[in-house]
């Protein structure tokens, strides 16, 4: 099959469909199998805690001649404890070392939130640990300071593109105005319960490619014990979604992915089982109708599952 690509504002191209590596079991083998299946985009992060394993799968595939490094698009993310300018490159180099790679194609600021620095030898990845039990400790690091340090990574050839994740439209606009290197990509929670139409439209108007995560809505957050997810009807059981799926002879999951992808948004679903790799990769081989889109639009509840306000009343989206 021929992969579809979106063009970033620096001329580089990102596949429209990739694999998300959050909570990916048997990561090395799954990544290797995904490359063999035809995947070229892998969405990763320091916070996922499996960059060594993902890197192992990537390097094994390269060594076996399945693919060349230049044909892959590897995304990683800067975690909250490493936002101070003196720590950004350290965090990047740690991730590159774990991957055994020389560069990332895209490096995202995971959240616009700055926690206290935690040395790698103390706890890595630190997650929500800030050096004092379960207590959140913050550093007064403005976003632009972190961004300037990320721009330097581009200058040094350590990353090809930089972007942001989990930000509001106002913060994105402010960053665009102040940035020397504009954000190339925006990654957001995106599903029919949280459509974020204005943010998506604004980013696309600015030439920023949007990637949507958690396209199945509450499903991704159930294993985290998310109370909102527990109380929400799974999208794959929603009558609107199941009706559209039956009409097209597809599964509800395929409809949910195609809805995102058909809006010009990249998707990065996790594949837990090898037999779902091909299904997800070929999700662009059918089209939803205008009527399908109109029905799905009615499902928007502005319902966010990944909300830092629930962590510690962090006002990322208030």
UniProtKB/Swiss-Prot annotation:
GO terms for biological process: D-xylose catabolic process. One of its GO terms (molecular function) is D-xylose reductase (NADPH) activity. Its EC number is 1.1.1.307. The record marks 77 as: Lowers pKa of active site Tyr. Signal peptide: none annotated. The active site is at 48 (proton donor). It catalyses: xylitol + NAD(+) = D-xylose + NADH + H(+); xylitol + NADP(+) = D-xylose + NADPH + H(+). Substrate binds at residue 110. Disulfide bonds: none annotated. Gene3D superfamilies: NADP-dependent oxidoreductase domain. Pfam families: Aldo_ket_red. Reduces D-xylose into xylitol. Has a preference for NADPH, but can also utilize NADH as cosubstrate. Belongs to the aldo/keto reductase family. This is NAD(P)H-dependent D-xylose reductase. It comes from Pachysolen tannophilus. The gene is XYL1.
